[in-house]
Structure formats: structure tokens, C-alpha cells
Design a protein with these regions (language model features):
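Non-catalytic terminal accessory segments
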Residues: 1-123, 364
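Soluble catalytic domains of enzymes that build or remodel membrane lipids, polysaccharides, and related
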Residues: 133-364
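Hydrophobic alpha-helical transmembrane segments in integral membrane proteins
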Residues: 107, 112-138, 155-160
Length: 364
């Protein structure tokens, strides 16, 4: 219900602002048919969430797609309206003619092109390789780790998407798979309806598949969701840890949205000096604390690097490391761009990714 209220409020604001912008600058938008179509598209973000879970899956997906595409269009229309307003103000002060209808037309064409590219980009994952050396592991004691985050299985991303992800991961032949949360998008019902978790059971990693919860994993009965994940041989670490070969210690934290302090992070750091210690923390907010507690590798996701350009200007200012790799004293931190998406099937920032970590032992 909270998500519906939030989405509904955002949709209403976008609808009002962008509709009036087009009414001012596009003669065709004066027709009743334009208004009704625009209203219908805007309502799909609510319709897709309000449909009963027993509704046909195709209807749920179609409504979700229409609503998501409209939201991206409306977002960029809002940016276009702001740009148009600034140019209009400049024209009044400086005294030049602003061809408003032509500017709006060029802007709309650019938006459609941008969204078309973003819809392709959202389904074009890349593999990013990171090489890390450590003296805590013996020379020749190497691990190939696949690091994932933000898969977001649900109304838009289902079984086929999970199957392609599994195939891509298995092609990399990892020893270990780590997931930094948000396997779920919003409701389990859509995952169960399509059996979207089943392909993840086919992930081939001899040392195991482990994950920490993200904020979305709590949205629908987190305990039953954990049980379903573990039925697919995914071990969930919630303020807990596990060992790999007695050499690597894996720590998974509850998401920052549930527990903002660092008490558990510190408690779980006991004996870190004896192991190569990896910590999974969905939101990249506790890097400095992890470094001070003696962790070796900090893995996070969540940011999607804003997903829609130019939102990374915001994520860069919110998080210490919204994307990529950085060193915090002796600790390495990596933030994953995410494999899925949320809200709209568009990515106009960085492409979705799988991070392949080559952990190389250099010790005696």
C-alpha cells in the first residue's frame, strides 16, 4: 500500500506538469483523445499494482511495461519542461526569439530516441572484471567470484530473465556466487506465478551461493522469502556469517533500512585477522566502518547509478562509492551497478552488470 501511495503521488505530479506542458506547446495535445490516452498510460503504474494477483500474467506485465515506459517519458518530459522554462526566462532577459513549438518537438523526438536506447541498454548486461590480490591466501590459492546485486524479480523481470542470468553466470565458471540483495522486486506472488526463482537453483558454484538482504527483500514476508531462497540453494546471511574452505569468511548484514548502526558489523568482525573476510552490505553506506573493523572486501549494490540519466549526479553525492571500486585503507570496496532495474524497464545510465572478481592468493 505504501508503494502504491508513493507511486500514485509521483505519477500525479508528473501527469499534471507534463500534460500542461504539452498542452501549451503541442496543438495536437488539445484533443480529448490525447488527454485520455495520456491519462490511461499514466494510470498503468497504479493499475499494474492494483490488479489482483490472480490476474493473467500477460495483463500484469503489459500494464507494468506501459506504466514504466510512461514514467520514463514523463520524467524526461519534466526535464524538458524545466529546460524550456529556463530558456524562456533567458529569452525574456536577453531578448531573443524562442521557437517554443519547435523546441518542444525536438525535445520529444530526443526523449523517444533516448528511451529506445535505454530499453536496449537495460537488457544488455556486461561483465566487469576486478582482480584482487591478498597475502591472506596462499600462493596459488585463487577464487573466481561472481558478484551480483539488484536482480529485482517480479512483475517486469521473470523466469526467462533469471534463466539468462543463470546461463551467463555459469559460463564464467565461478567458484563462488555472492549477491548483495534485492533478488525480489516487490511481491512474491509474481515470482511464484512465473516460478522465476527456479533458474537460480541451476547456478553452478562449487563453493556455494550466498546473499544478504536488500531493502526490497523485506517488502513481502521476509521470512517466507528467505525460506524460498534457501530452497534454491541460496544461503541467506542476515547479520550472520559463513566460511568457505576455512579460509574465507563471508559476512552478510541486514539492510541499512532495517538497521542503521554498526554494532552487528563490529560484532561479526571477531577474528577477521585470521581469514580473508568479505562483507555483503546492500547499500554502500558502511564502508568506512567496515574498513575500521578489519574487513578485506566490501561488496554493495542498491544504487543502479541512478538508473535514469542524469540521476547519477544524485547518487554520487549520497554514497561514498555509488559505483566502481575504491580502497579504504587496506580494504577494497566494490559497488555493483545491479543486474535488473526498478520501476521502469529503462536504463539510460550504465548498463546492468555482472562483476567477476578474481581473488588471487600471494601469501606463503
Amino acid at each position: 500500500m505504501h508503494i502504491i501511495i508513493f507511486i500514485g503521488t509521483v505519477n500525479l505530479l508528473l501527469l499534471l506538469i507534463t500534460y500542461f506542458y504539452y498542452r501549451i506547446n503541442f496543438p495536437l495535445s488539445h484533443s480529448l483523445s490525447f488527454g485520455l490516452i495520456y491519462l490511461f498510460l499514466a494510470c498503468n503504474n497504479i493499475i499494474s499494482r492494483a490488479l489482483p494477483e490472480t490476474a493473467p500474467l500477460l495483463l500484469i506485465k503489459a500494464s507494468s511495461w506501459l506504466g514504466g515506459l510512461w514514467m520514463a517519458f514523463a520524467y524526461y518530459s519534466l526535464l524538458l519542461a524545466v529546460l524550456h522554462l529556463l530558456l524562456w526566462l533567458a529569452s525574456k532577459f536577453i531578448g531573443f526569439h524562442l521557437p517554443s513549438e519547435k523546441l518542444a518537438l525536438v525535445g520529444v523526438i530526443a526523449i523517444f530516441c533516448f528511451i529506445a536506447w535505454g530499453s536496449i541498454n537495460a537488457y544488455s548486461p556486461v561483465v566487469r572484471t576486478e582482480r584482487i590480490t591478498t597475502a591472506k591466501l596462499s600462493h596459488g590459492e585463487n577464487y573466481k567470484i561472481v558478484f551480483l546485486s539488484d536482480i529485482h524479480l517480479g512483475r517486469l523481470l521473470g523466469k526467462d530473465y533469471a534463466q539468462r542470468l543463470t546461463e551467463r553466470v555459469n559460463q564464467l565458471q565461478p567458484d563462488l556466487v555472492l549477491v548483495a540483495g534485492d533478488v525480489l522486486d516487490e511481491k512474491q506472488a509474481y515470482v511464484l506465478k512465473e516460478n522465476s526463482l527456479a533458474p537460480l537453483c541451476q547456478l553452478k558454484a562449487p563453493k556455494g551461493v550466498f546473499m544478504a538482504y536488500g531493502n526490497h527483500d523485506y517488502l513481502d514476508q521476509p521470512l517466507s522469502w528467505q525460506k524460498r531462497l534457501e530452497e534454491q540453494n541460496i544461503q541467506v546471511l542476515r547479520d550472520s556469517y559463513a566460511f568457505v574452505d576455512g579460509r574465507i569468511k563471508l559476512v552478510g548484514l541486514e539492510d541499512y533500512s532495517k538497521n542503521k548502526d554498526v554494532k552487528e558489523l563490529k560484532r561479526l568482525s571477531s577474528n577477521n585477522q585470521h581469514y580473508y573476510t568479505i562483507i555483503l552490505d546492500h547499500q554502500p553506506r558502511r564502508m568506512q566502518a567496515a574498513s575500521e573493523a578489519g574487513y578485506d572486501l566490501y561488496l554493495a549494490g542498491h544504487t543502479h547509478t541512478g538508473q535514469l540519466f542524469p540521476n547519477r549526479l544524485i547518487t554520487k553525492r549520497i554514497y561514498l562509492l555509488d559505483y566502481g571500486r575504491a580502497a579504504f585503507d587496506s580494504m577494497t570496496a566494490i559497488t555493483n551497478n545491479g543486474y535488473g532495474y526498478w520501476g521502469t524497464p529503462i536504463r539510460t545510465e550504465k548498463a546492468p552488470e555482472i562483476v567477476l572478481i578474481q581473488l588471487i592468493g600471494t601469501g606463503k
